[in-house]
Amino acid sequence: MKEYFSVKMRASLQGRHVSGAERIVLKEDLPTVISQLSQRPKEYDSLNIKVEKINDLNYIEKSLNVKTINVKDWIEGNKVAVEILQNQGVDKKIAEKYINLIHQGAVNGENMRGAMIVNLSGERVEKDKTRGIRTVNIDFEDRKAITELLKEKGYTERTVDALALATKTLNHPDIVAEYCISDDPSYTTGYVATKTTYYRINPLKQLSNEKGGRIYFVKDTANIEDIYQYLESEAFLIKQLGDLQ
Protein backbone atom coordinates (compact mmCIF):
# COMPACT_ATOMS: atom_id res chain seq x y z
CA MET A 1 0.00 0.00 0.00
CA LYS A 2 1.30 3.46 -0.95
CA GLU A 3 2.35 5.71 1.92
CA TYR A 4 1.98 9.44 1.34
CA PHE A 5 3.58 12.24 3.34
CA SER A 6 3.03 15.98 3.55
CA VAL A 7 6.23 18.04 3.31
CA LYS A 8 5.97 21.73 4.22
CA MET A 9 8.84 24.23 3.97
CA ARG A 10 8.86 27.69 5.52
CA ALA A 11 11.79 30.11 5.42
CA SER A 12 12.19 33.52 7.03
CA LEU A 13 14.75 36.31 7.17
CA GLN A 14 14.97 38.66 10.17
CA GLY A 15 11.55 37.47 11.29
CA ARG A 16 9.88 38.05 7.91
CA HIS A 17 8.46 35.16 5.88
CA VAL A 18 10.37 34.91 2.58
CA SER A 19 9.49 31.51 1.12
CA GLY A 20 7.06 28.65 1.55
CA ALA A 21 6.21 25.49 -0.35
CA GLU A 22 4.38 22.23 0.11
CA ARG A 23 4.35 18.78 -1.46
CA ILE A 24 2.42 15.56 -0.97
CA VAL A 25 4.74 12.72 -1.95
CA LEU A 26 5.35 9.00 -1.63
CA LYS A 27 7.62 7.87 1.18
CA GLU A 28 10.38 6.83 -1.23
CA ASP A 29 10.48 10.34 -2.72
CA LEU A 30 10.96 12.13 0.61
CA PRO A 31 14.79 12.55 0.45
CA THR A 32 14.65 14.11 -3.03
CA VAL A 33 11.76 16.44 -2.24
CA ILE A 34 13.21 17.57 1.10
CA SER A 35 16.48 18.40 -0.68
CA GLN A 36 14.65 20.32 -3.42
CA LEU A 37 12.58 22.37 -0.99
CA SER A 38 15.59 23.21 1.19
CA GLN A 39 17.27 24.78 -1.86
CA ARG A 40 14.24 26.81 -2.94
CA PRO A 41 14.61 29.94 -0.78
CA LYS A 42 17.47 32.18 -1.92
CA GLU A 43 18.19 34.01 1.32
CA TYR A 44 17.10 33.13 4.86
CA ASP A 45 18.26 32.83 8.45
CA SER A 46 15.60 30.32 9.51
CA LEU A 47 14.42 27.29 7.53
CA ASN A 48 11.85 24.80 8.78
CA ILE A 49 10.79 21.60 7.02
CA LYS A 50 7.91 19.60 8.50
CA VAL A 51 7.11 16.04 7.40
CA GLU A 52 3.86 14.31 8.38
CA LYS A 53 2.29 11.05 7.29
CA ILE A 54 -1.11 11.39 5.62
CA ASN A 55 -3.59 8.78 6.79
CA ASP A 56 -6.66 9.92 4.88
CA LEU A 57 -6.08 11.09 1.30
CA ASN A 58 -8.79 12.50 -0.98
CA TYR A 59 -8.75 13.14 -4.73
CA ILE A 60 -9.92 15.86 -7.10
CA GLU A 61 -10.31 14.56 -10.66
CA LYS A 62 -9.23 17.66 -12.56
CA SER A 63 -7.77 21.09 -11.81
CA LEU A 64 -9.45 24.34 -12.73
CA ASN A 65 -9.09 25.40 -16.36
CA VAL A 66 -6.38 28.02 -16.93
CA LYS A 67 -6.88 31.24 -18.88
CA THR A 68 -4.35 34.07 -19.15
CA ILE A 69 -5.56 37.66 -19.54
CA ASN A 70 -2.92 40.26 -20.46
CA VAL A 71 -3.82 43.89 -19.76
CA LYS A 72 -2.06 47.25 -20.14
CA ASP A 73 -1.67 47.97 -16.41
CA TRP A 74 -2.68 46.81 -12.93
CA ILE A 75 -5.63 49.23 -12.79
CA GLU A 76 -7.17 47.63 -15.87
CA GLY A 77 -6.27 44.21 -14.45
CA ASN A 78 -8.32 44.89 -11.34
CA LYS A 79 -11.27 46.11 -13.39
CA VAL A 80 -11.21 42.76 -15.18
CA ALA A 81 -10.90 40.96 -11.83
CA VAL A 82 -13.93 42.79 -10.42
CA GLU A 83 -15.98 41.92 -13.53
CA ILE A 84 -15.15 38.24 -13.08
CA LEU A 85 -16.10 38.42 -9.40
CA GLN A 86 -19.38 40.17 -10.26
CA ASN A 87 -20.20 37.29 -12.60
CA GLN A 88 -19.91 34.98 -9.58
CA GLY A 89 -22.40 37.03 -7.57
CA VAL A 90 -19.95 39.28 -5.70
CA ASP A 91 -21.18 42.88 -5.40
CA LYS A 92 -18.89 45.38 -7.19
CA LYS A 93 -18.46 47.68 -4.16
CA ILE A 94 -17.69 44.76 -1.87
CA ALA A 95 -15.11 43.37 -4.32
CA GLU A 96 -13.42 46.77 -4.72
CA LYS A 97 -13.36 47.43 -0.96
CA TYR A 98 -11.52 44.23 -0.09
CA ILE A 99 -9.24 44.29 -3.14
CA ASN A 100 -8.09 47.78 -2.07
CA LEU A 101 -7.46 46.42 1.42
CA ILE A 102 -5.22 43.66 0.01
CA HIS A 103 -3.20 46.19 -2.00
CA GLN A 104 -2.74 48.46 1.03
CA GLY A 105 -1.91 45.74 3.58
CA ALA A 106 -3.10 45.23 7.14
CA VAL A 107 -3.66 48.06 9.63
CA ASN A 108 -0.18 47.56 11.11
CA GLY A 109 1.37 47.98 7.64
CA GLU A 110 2.19 44.29 7.28
CA ASN A 111 0.78 41.72 4.88
CA MET A 112 -2.13 39.60 5.98
CA ARG A 113 -0.76 36.21 7.01
CA GLY A 114 -3.60 34.15 5.58
CA ALA A 115 -6.63 34.68 3.39
CA MET A 116 -9.61 36.83 4.30
CA ILE A 117 -13.02 35.15 4.16
CA VAL A 118 -15.68 37.56 2.92
CA ASN A 119 -19.33 36.58 2.50
CA LEU A 120 -21.58 37.91 -0.24
CA SER A 121 -23.08 40.43 2.20
CA GLY A 122 -19.62 41.98 2.55
CA GLU A 123 -18.80 40.75 6.07
CA ARG A 124 -15.39 39.36 7.02
CA VAL A 125 -16.09 36.05 8.69
CA GLU A 126 -12.69 34.43 9.29
CA LYS A 127 -12.18 33.38 12.92
CA ASP A 128 -8.95 35.35 13.40
CA LYS A 129 -8.56 38.47 11.25
CA THR A 130 -4.81 38.70 11.92
CA ARG A 131 -4.04 35.10 11.05
CA GLY A 132 -6.67 34.57 8.36
CA ILE A 133 -7.04 31.10 6.86
CA ARG A 134 -4.63 28.98 4.81
CA THR A 135 -5.24 26.38 2.14
CA VAL A 136 -2.77 23.53 2.72
CA ASN A 137 -2.34 19.79 2.11
CA ILE A 138 -2.72 19.85 -1.67
CA ASP A 139 -0.61 18.73 -4.64
CA PHE A 140 -0.85 17.13 -8.07
CA GLU A 141 -0.69 13.33 -8.17
CA ASP A 142 1.88 13.47 -10.98
CA ARG A 143 3.42 16.84 -10.24
CA LYS A 144 6.37 16.34 -12.60
CA ALA A 145 4.15 15.71 -15.64
CA ILE A 146 1.81 18.61 -14.79
CA THR A 147 4.76 20.96 -14.31
CA GLU A 148 6.23 19.97 -17.69
CA LEU A 149 2.87 20.52 -19.42
CA LEU A 150 2.48 23.98 -17.90
CA LYS A 151 6.08 25.00 -18.63
CA GLU A 152 5.64 23.96 -22.27
CA LYS A 153 2.84 26.54 -22.44
CA GLY A 154 5.00 29.26 -20.89
CA TYR A 155 3.83 28.94 -17.29
CA THR A 156 6.11 28.62 -14.25
CA GLU A 157 6.42 26.65 -11.02
CA ARG A 158 4.48 29.47 -9.35
CA THR A 159 1.49 28.61 -11.54
CA VAL A 160 1.69 24.94 -10.55
CA ASP A 161 1.52 25.82 -6.85
CA ALA A 162 -1.15 28.51 -7.19
CA LEU A 163 -3.33 26.38 -9.46
CA ALA A 164 -3.25 23.50 -6.97
CA LEU A 165 -4.21 25.79 -4.08
CA ALA A 166 -7.01 27.48 -6.03
CA THR A 167 -8.37 24.14 -7.24
CA LYS A 168 -8.68 22.82 -3.69
CA THR A 169 -10.16 26.08 -2.42
CA LEU A 170 -12.84 26.35 -5.11
CA ASN A 171 -13.69 22.66 -4.72
CA HIS A 172 -15.45 23.55 -1.44
CA PRO A 173 -19.20 24.03 -2.12
CA ASP A 174 -19.49 27.23 -0.06
CA ILE A 175 -16.57 29.09 -1.71
CA VAL A 176 -17.63 30.97 -4.85
CA ALA A 177 -14.44 32.82 -5.89
CA GLU A 178 -10.90 33.78 -4.90
CA TYR A 179 -8.73 36.85 -5.53
CA CYS A 180 -4.95 36.67 -5.05
CA ILE A 181 -1.82 38.79 -5.49
CA SER A 182 1.70 37.86 -4.37
CA ASP A 183 3.62 39.82 -1.73
CA ASP A 184 6.71 39.60 -3.96
CA PRO A 185 7.30 43.23 -5.10
CA SER A 186 8.76 42.07 -8.42
CA TYR A 187 5.89 39.67 -9.26
CA THR A 188 2.87 41.52 -10.58
CA THR A 189 0.79 38.68 -12.05
CA GLY A 190 -2.19 37.66 -9.93
CA TYR A 191 -5.32 35.62 -10.36
CA VAL A 192 -9.03 35.29 -9.82
CA ALA A 193 -10.41 31.76 -9.48
CA THR A 194 -14.00 30.65 -10.02
CA LYS A 195 -15.70 27.25 -9.88
CA THR A 196 -14.44 26.43 -13.38
CA THR A 197 -11.48 28.65 -14.22
CA TYR A 198 -8.20 30.03 -12.90
CA TYR A 199 -7.90 33.48 -14.54
CA ARG A 200 -4.25 34.51 -14.56
CA ILE A 201 -4.23 38.31 -14.92
CA ASN A 202 -1.03 40.13 -15.92
CA PRO A 203 -0.52 42.56 -14.27
CA LEU A 204 -2.84 42.60 -11.26
CA LYS A 205 -0.70 44.73 -8.96
CA GLN A 206 1.74 47.62 -9.19
CA LEU A 207 5.45 46.83 -9.58
CA SER A 208 7.41 47.29 -6.31
CA ASN A 209 4.28 46.95 -4.13
CA GLU A 210 5.25 44.64 -1.27
CA LYS A 211 1.66 44.01 -0.25
CA GLY A 212 -0.15 40.80 -1.13
CA GLY A 213 -2.79 38.36 0.02
CA ARG A 214 -5.92 36.39 -0.77
CA ILE A 215 -9.66 36.85 -0.46
CA TYR A 216 -12.04 33.89 -0.38
CA PHE A 217 -15.59 34.96 -1.25
CA VAL A 218 -18.16 32.63 0.30
CA LYS A 219 -21.93 32.18 0.41
CA ASP A 220 -23.82 33.93 3.21
CA THR A 221 -24.91 30.49 4.42
CA ALA A 222 -21.32 29.14 4.49
CA ASN A 223 -20.33 26.88 7.38
CA ILE A 224 -17.10 28.58 8.50
CA GLU A 225 -16.00 25.75 10.79
CA ASP A 226 -16.39 23.31 7.90
CA ILE A 227 -14.34 25.59 5.60
CA TYR A 228 -11.49 25.69 8.15
CA GLN A 229 -11.56 21.91 8.55
CA TYR A 230 -11.55 21.37 4.79
CA LEU A 231 -8.87 23.90 3.83
CA GLU A 232 -6.46 23.42 6.72
CA SER A 233 -6.82 19.74 7.64
CA GLU A 234 -8.03 17.59 4.73
CA ALA A 235 -5.44 16.33 2.23
CA PHE A 236 -6.03 16.16 -1.53
CA LEU A 237 -4.23 15.12 -4.70
CA ILE A 238 -5.34 16.44 -8.09
CA LYS A 239 -5.31 13.76 -10.80
CA GLN A 240 -5.40 15.74 -14.06
CA LEU A 241 -4.77 19.19 -15.48
CA GLY A 242 -7.78 21.19 -16.68
CA ASP A 243 -7.97 22.89 -20.07
CA LEU A 244 -5.32 25.48 -20.95
CA GLN A 245 -6.94 28.36 -22.83
Swiss-Prot record:
Pathway: Metabolic intermediate metabolism; pimeloyl-CoA biosynthesis; pimeloyl-CoA from pimelate: step 1/1. The keyword Nucleotide-binding applies. GO terms for biological process: biotin biosynthetic process. InterPro entries: BioW. NCBIfam families: bioW, PRK01322.1. Catalyzes the transformation of pimelate into pimeloyl-CoA with concomitant hydrolysis of ATP to AMP. This is 6-carboxyhexanoate--CoA ligase.
